[in-house]
Amino acid sequence: MKYLKIKLILLFLLIGITSCKQDKRKLFIIGDSISIGYTPFVTENLKNIAEVSHNPGNAQHTGTGLSNIETWIEANDWDIIQFNWGLWDLCYRHPDSKVQGHRDKKNGTITYSLHDYASNLDSIVTILKTKTNAKLIFVTTTYVPENEAGRFQNDVIRYNEAAKKIMKKHSIMVNDIYEQSILIHKKFGKGLDDVHYSKEGYEKLSEHVTEFLKTEIK
């Protein structure tokens, strides 16, 4: 009788664990190196309620997004898809530039104009809404320091505003982390010429991402 009780307890525990695993929401994050930086922290923060994945590699600009979005999302039946494009789109590059990534805002050519960025983003959202039933969340593009070699500081504001209009058109939620990213970058940025963050910076960004996602994971 004693062994039967033990077996029943173990069975209930196993059922409970399996149920918890099945109840976890599938979250897919799409983005560039900024999201690659904070995704491990988001994964840890949400480990009890969500299974978090990131698109393979760097999502780069909206052109890359258009080419790959269907392949990326077909890998799973996602509950939530969080996405961002922006920093690569507004970047100026020149083939002769010696700066990493051939960035050059003085002599280079912008990757995607504001108009083309908005158009590409509109097409991507249309694909997402057509191909998946996932809840969609757009995260705004983060801060660009003044001395960044290939990007103008004010362009981020313009591109974010354009993105918000597209999201409003499609009734997509927006997690606007731009203002927070400024404060975080000033303390934990990699420099006045670098859009990236230290480990502590990515952890701070992840807190704002996690907080928003928790309200949507039900």
Locations of regions flagged by a protein language model:
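Alpha-helical cap/lid subdomain in secreted, periplasmic
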Residues: 22-23, 64-218
